[in-house]
């Protein structure tokens, strides 16, 4: 039995290394005519998807199922996003709005228009930016248990959208939705999970951000 376990983990490690070496994502770039006009990007605080609240941002997600969102989800994802974006500071200047700053600006804009594209344009005008990065949280459920033994796994779902400040149109969008599963159900998930343990919701969200930002368009 011990020899079998050693063989099992050896196979997992080999698969993990081979997946890392064979699946390099090609860097995405904005079209020149668009990229030359974008120097600063306004980063909005994450918004929670709720049946009871109205969103003024167009976010055409395809397969995401909404669920419970932990009270700490917004703060956690805002912090993780800021950390990820620091890797792209040589390409763009990121302007981060606090919740209060965003509410003050958006309330002024909504007095004039509720058109999603026009809202994007006005946000950029008021902040002297050329693009807007918007995030929406659909699900953020903490695991029940420890990293080695769980009752229920962590489950996270969110989307990020980059809008062009000149036209209000979407330049880039990615969504991430994942409920951690045992590696015995899908060995390919070892690349996402990274370790042979049960992740917290924050750890799963951070891995999700790293994954989707592999396609973030540069200039």
Language-model features: where?
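Bacterial N-terminal signal peptides that target proteins for export
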Residues: 1-9
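Short proline/glycine-enriched turn/loop segments at secondary-structure junctions
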Residues: 2, 147-150
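Bacterial N-terminal signal peptides
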Residues: 10-18
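C-terminal/domain-edge helix-coil "capping" segments
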Residues: 22-53, 123-127, 139, 150-219
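Short structured motifs
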Residues: 27-28, 118-120, 143-145
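N-terminal segment of the mature soluble domain
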Residues: 47-136, 165, 169-173, 202-203, ...
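Residue-level detector of alpha-helix boundaries and kinks
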Residues: 66, 70, 108, 145, ...
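Short, solvent-exposed loop/turn segments at secondary-structure junctions
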Residues: 104-106, 140-145
